[in-house]
Amino acid sequence: SSDLEFSIIDRYFKRTSKVDVSLGIGDDSAIITPPPSQQLVICTDTLVAGRHFPLETSAHAIGWKSVAVNLSDIAAMGAKPHSILLALSLPHVDEAWLAEFSRGLFDCCDQFSVSLIGGDTTQSTQLTISVTALGWIDHGQAVTRSGAQIGDYICVSGQVGDAAYGLKHLGHPLQQRLDYPTPRCQLGQQIGRAHV
């Protein structure tokens, strides 16, 4: 780890964590105290510039989306999102871009009561963002794909295809659905509690 890496972390990504995070950003690993009778749900998504978002996407939108796509996966399992880890690979350090990216990331974290508890930054030839999200669910209550049975209902929330349309028609109002997806965290938890 370099002085530049620690400077980026301190300036753009270090914030107070939840009370159950005994050790967060700044050490080699984070330490979390798990709630009783809960299971940990973990997922990771990687976003690559030019593949998962257009190169001209605002840094704020990229920050938001990098968190939101992971929270959607946590919600799909019926879990309550808790925290994220961020691995950020940058082609160059751009202070204005980092400020907007971190603002978008924390705007999404704050809206869904999620803490950034660690991660890594490095330099690379291409902008790549990997977020790992952690959530909690009551033991044995996860909604899994493999748990689906013949006769079960398959439900979709939101409008299918809006983000894809926004990608093909940049500048159209539906691009907002591509840039700022809305994780259905409350709905996911309700489905999980209902044992659906």
Where are these regions (language model features)?
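Helix-biased detector of long, well-ordered alpha-helical tracts
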Residues: 2-193
